[in-house]
């Protein structure tokens, strides 16, 4: 026959074209069967898969075909054209007969292979040498293509579809590749129950991301392998479908549907032996439905309803609502299994089950206290994710962090290395000098280098020894895991002799060695001389949480304890004259960091009342500075911007359908990004009353739902509200101690008139800031002058202010109504401006001291 592209499938024709190019490259005049056989093998496609099924080593077989080809006579140069040889012509005729025998429309790869197996020139000889007969080849072809017929020019895409587009979870469970599944018995039992139904035997697992939906299916695969399932599921295959691979590369209309049909056909023809698992099943809805093509879910519906296809789906609550509930016909074919977040004790059990896997992977030990801390701390502090996923991630990252420390050079050795490098450079420099001082220094350096060299070598030896011991421990754990897998496989195959030999011989020996190695390491860890740690502790977990969220949950070290105990004194140094306010704020922070504050409420919520300029906002800034080392580290909401009713949406985000829905709220977004913060609501009385309705949940439950439906956690925030309400009463009665109760009563009446009782009742404390006395203003002068001095230091100038000048500034800046702000203006006017003019006029140069004194009702600067 004269071959044309229309007679062949795409891959078969590509092989013939490749064979022609191979003949030209080999300088052969005729195109023969060995060229075609080698071209088929080099395709790395169906021919190789079929031959592998017969037990042939394809690489070795390809080498033998190449050797046969090299023995053919060749021309001196590549021919312009290649002629079809008699053997190949006959082989193509036989391939045509095979096509008709299979009832196919096109000559495919398998027809060519069968034709070449009957080739007297070389094919029969080469294949029989490899142990392949026509019958074994036919069996392999049937195994690969099943009972499908070739009706288009790309049939290879539909062969072994499940192997190409799926992953066998039962095979993975058999090989020990899946993590153990702890708990979830109720959900697995319900899934098995639904799968055992006659029709609509399709469970869909619905739950939040990270609660363990895929793990339930993996648990089912492990139960199938262990035979721990009812008769209806015994020896079944559980295959997970990769929707991405199914869609990828489907260029033409109908190609995706063809692939999916091939997968579904394989599943249905297996007579219930295959259970399909589609993770993220909502991707099936609308998949492939572009330009008039059919939606993938419509291909599934008839099979799902009749019970021909047993399918497990998994999706989140939101995706199920958005995609699957919109298609009631698809929804009714699936039975819902709701998967809730496990409790903290359940999560601890799950972590204990996974512990060994993570220890083997990272080569470190994980303390049980670290697992408990991971479950409890992640539950409390990581509120936007779900257990057990977030707890597992914490353990994983903590172990990875410790492993990185083990493999990196210890700090002690690194410091010595740097010191040696520094001294070597100094030695090199001094070697060129001839004076006695340099020579003396050189001798000292050489002595120091000798000492450091000894330290370096002993520490390096110790490091390598400790590292080797840890690596040995890790290798033993890996070996134990491998032997345990062999024991399980032997028990499944009823090879009890081998199982007993492994379990009571090899495994027992390995476990004894492991115990000895662990005891040795524990003895070394007991001393303070070790360079490496090899156990993940709860402190490691706390440090990782602090990195993730910015919330300081690590165990308090001595320096931080002292810092917290001194917090009140530090705040007093910056906020003058407001003892009650400073004490209340410091107490709240100390309660929180000691772990005694209510986990379901903010750390503290205060309403600061008082006249303007007495330190309400300054105290908030001082607190932010002490906690986060920056005045700007607080979230400041100016309530004067929320005077209209509609501005509530700016705080928590616009509702769906409104402009700015995607942007989120100013308050909620700030807290989501920085959960540990000081939040200042400045001038609250200026805001619209409806704004306070939003704050009720924040103050009481430490949470609020933003415009996008996300719950934002405020339990690690300090809420400070400032207001000028009642400031007139404070000014009138503050000076007289006897009138203090009357003043508080009048302020409370003013508060009740402005704010609702449910709002006031939720605040931890309402603190009245007194108006400032003249003595306190004198201390504020010292603070302000100190700040000016630090600014002058940048210009290499010093500032000396006499006591008389300080008293004079306090006198002219004293105004009970306006607090400390007039003082600030007085310092700017009387002190900063003259100094600035003197600098600009060139009267002050670097290194000078600015002397400030007072006389004749003004300051004198020299």
UniProtKB/Swiss-Prot annotation:
GO MF entry, a single one: ATP hydrolysis activity
Residue positions binding ATP 2: 610-617
Coiled coil residues, start to end: 392-526
InterPro entries membership: AAA+_ATPase, ATPase_AAA_core, Chaperonin_ClpB, Clp_ATPase_C, Clp_N_dom_sf, Clp_R_dom, ClpA/B, ClpA/B_CS1
Domain (Clp R) ranges: 5-147
Start and end residues of each stretch annotated as Linker: 342-550
Region (Repeat 2), start-end ranges: 84-147
Keywords for this protein: ATP-binding, Chaperone, Coiled coil, Cytoplasm, Nucleotide-binding, Repeat, Stress response
Gene3D superfamilies: 1.10.8.60, Clp, N-terminal domain (1.10.1780.10), P-loop containing nucleotide triphosphate hydrolases (3.40.50.300)
Predominant localisation class: cytoplasm
Example of a GO biological process term: protein refolding
GO cellular component, one term: cytoplasm
Region (Repeat 1): 8-72
Ranges where the record places region C-terminal: 772-862
Compartments, as annotated in UniProt: Cytoplasm
Cited SMART domains: AAA, ClpB_D2-small
Region (NBD2): 560-771
Matching PANTHER family: ATP-DEPENDENT CLP PROTEASE, HEAT SHOCK PROTEIN 104
Entry-linked NCBIfam families: chaperone_ClpB
Known partners and oligomeric status: Homohexamer. The oligomerization is ATP-dependent.
Record remark: domains: The Clp repeat (R) domain probably functions as a substrate-discriminating domain, recruiting aggregated proteins to the ClpB hexamer and/or stabilizing bound proteins. The NBD2 domain is responsible for oligomerization, whereas the NBD1 domain stabilizes the hexamer probably in an ATP-dependent manner. The movement of the coiled-coil domain is essential for ClpB ability to rescue proteins from an aggregated state, probably by pulling apart large aggregated proteins, which are bound between the coiled-coils motifs of adjacent ClpB subunits in the functional hexamer.
Function, as annotated: Part of a stress-induced multi-chaperone system, it is involved in the recovery of the cell from heat-induced damage, in cooperation with DnaK, DnaJ and GrpE. Acts before DnaK, in the processing of protein aggregates. Protein binding stimulates the ATPase activity; ATP hydrolysis unfolds the denatured protein aggregates, which probably helps expose new hydrophobic binding sites on the surface of ClpB-bound aggregates, contributing to the solubilization and refolding of denatured protein aggregates by DnaK.
Protein name as catalogued: Chaperone protein ClpB 1
Taxonomic source organism: Parasynechococcus marenigrum (strain WH8102)
């Amino acid at each position: 026959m004269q071959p044309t592209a229309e007679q062949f499938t795409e891959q078969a024709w590509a092989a013939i074209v490749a064979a022609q190019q191979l003949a030209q490259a080999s300088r052969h005049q005729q195109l023969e069967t060995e060229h075609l056989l080698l071209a088929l093998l080099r395709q790395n496609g169906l021919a190789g898969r079929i031959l592998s099924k017969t037990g042939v080593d394809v690489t070795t077989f390809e080498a033998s075909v190449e050797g046969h080809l090299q023995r053919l006579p060749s021309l001196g140069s590549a021919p312009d054209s290649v002629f079809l040889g008699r053997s190949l012509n006959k082989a193509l005729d036989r391939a045509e007969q095979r096509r008709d025998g299979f009832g196919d429309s096109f000559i495919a790869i398998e027809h060519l292979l069968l034709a070449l197996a009957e080739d007297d020139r070389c094919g029969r000889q080469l294949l029989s040498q490899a142990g392949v007969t026509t019958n074994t080849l036919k069996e392999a072809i049937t195994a690969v293509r099943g009972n499908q017929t070739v009706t288009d020019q790309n049939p290879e895409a539909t062969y072994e579809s499940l192997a190409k587009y799926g992953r066998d979870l039962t095979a993975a469970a058999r090989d020990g590749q899946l993590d153990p599944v702890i708990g979830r018995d109720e959900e697995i039992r319900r899934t098995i129950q639904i799968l055992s139904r006659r029709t609509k035997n399709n469970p869909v697992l619905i739950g939040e991301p990270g609660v363990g939906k895929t793990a339930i299916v993996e648990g089912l695969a492990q139960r199938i392998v262990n035979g721990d399932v009812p008769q209806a599921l015994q020896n079944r295959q559980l295959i997970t479908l990769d929707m991405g691979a199914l869609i990828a590369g489907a260029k033409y209309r109908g190609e995706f549907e063809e692939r999916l049909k091939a997968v579904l056909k394989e599943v249905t023809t297996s007579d219930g032996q295959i259970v399909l698992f589609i993770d993220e099943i909502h991707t099936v809805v609308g998949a492939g439905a572009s330009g008039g093509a059919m939606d993938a879910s419509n291909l599934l519906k008839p099979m799902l309803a009749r019970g021909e296809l047993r399918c497990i789906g998994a999706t989140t609550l939101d995706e199920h609502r958005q995609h699957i509930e919109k298609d009631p016909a698809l929804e009714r074919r699936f039975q819902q299994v709701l998967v809730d977040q496990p409790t903290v004790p359940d999560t601890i059990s799950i972590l204990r089950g996974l512990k060994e896997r993570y220890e083997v992977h990272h080569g470190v030990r994980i303390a049980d206290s670290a697992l408990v801390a991971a479950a409890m701390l992640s539950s409390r502090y990581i509120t936007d994710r779900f257990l057990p996923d977030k707890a597992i991630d914490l353990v994983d990252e903590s172990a990875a962090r410790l492993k990185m420390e083990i493999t990196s050079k210890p700090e002690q050795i690194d410091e010595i290395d740097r010191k040696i490098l520094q001294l070597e450079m100094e030695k090199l420099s001094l070697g060129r000098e001839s004076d006695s001082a340099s020579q003396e220094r050189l001798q000292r350096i050489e002595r120091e280098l000798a000492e450091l060299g000894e330290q370096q070598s002993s520490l390096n030896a110790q490091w390598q020894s400790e590292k080797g011991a840890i690596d040995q421990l890790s290798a033993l754990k890996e070996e134990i895991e491998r032997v345990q897998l062999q024991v399980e496989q032997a028990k499944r195959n009823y090879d009890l002799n081998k199982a007993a030999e492994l379990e009571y011989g090899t495994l027992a020996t390995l476990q004894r060695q492991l115990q000895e190695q662990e005891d040795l390491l524990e003895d070394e860890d007991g001393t303070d001389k070790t360079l490496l740690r090899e156990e993940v502790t709860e402190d490691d977990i706390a440090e990782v949480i602090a990195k993730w969220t910015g919330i300081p949950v690590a165990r308090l070290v001595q320096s931080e304890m002292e810092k917290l105990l001194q917090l009140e004194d530090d705040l007093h140094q910056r906020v003058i004259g407001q003892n009650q306010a400073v004490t209340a704020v410091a107490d709240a922070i100390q309660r929180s960091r000691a772990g005694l504050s209510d986990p379901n409420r903010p750390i503290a919520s205060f309403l600061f009342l008082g006249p303007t300029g007495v330190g309400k906002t300054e105290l908030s800034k001082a607190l932010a500075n002490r906690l986060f080392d920056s005045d700007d580290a607080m979230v400041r909401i100016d309530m004067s911007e929320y005077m209209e009713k509609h501005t509530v949406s700016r705080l928590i985000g616009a509702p769906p359908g409104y402009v700015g829905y995607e942007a989120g709220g100013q308050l909620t977004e700030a807290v989501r990004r920085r959960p540990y913060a000081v939040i200042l609501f400045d001038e609250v009385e200026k805001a619209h009353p409806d704004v306070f309705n939003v704050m009720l949940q924040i103050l009481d439950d430490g949470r609020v739902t933003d415009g996008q439906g996300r719950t934002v956690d405020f339990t690690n925030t300090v809420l400070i509200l400032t207001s000028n309400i009642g400031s007139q009463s404070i000014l009138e009665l503050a000076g007289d101690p006897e009138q203090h109760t009357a003043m508080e009563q009048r302020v409370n009446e003013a508060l009740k008139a402005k704010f609702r009782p449910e709002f006031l009742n939720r605040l931890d404390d309402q603190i009245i800031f007194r108006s400032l006395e003249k003595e306190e203003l004198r201390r504020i002068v010292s603070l302000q002058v100190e700040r000016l001095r630090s600014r002058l230091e940048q210009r290499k100038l010093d500032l000396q202010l006499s006591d008389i000048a300080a008293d004079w500034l306090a006198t002219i800046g004293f105004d009970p109504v306006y607090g400390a702000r007039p003082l600030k203006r007085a310092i700017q006017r009387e002190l900063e401006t003259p100094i600035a003019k003197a600098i600009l006029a060139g009267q002050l140069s670097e290194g000078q001291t600015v002397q400030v004194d007072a006389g004749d009702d003004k300051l004198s600067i020299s």
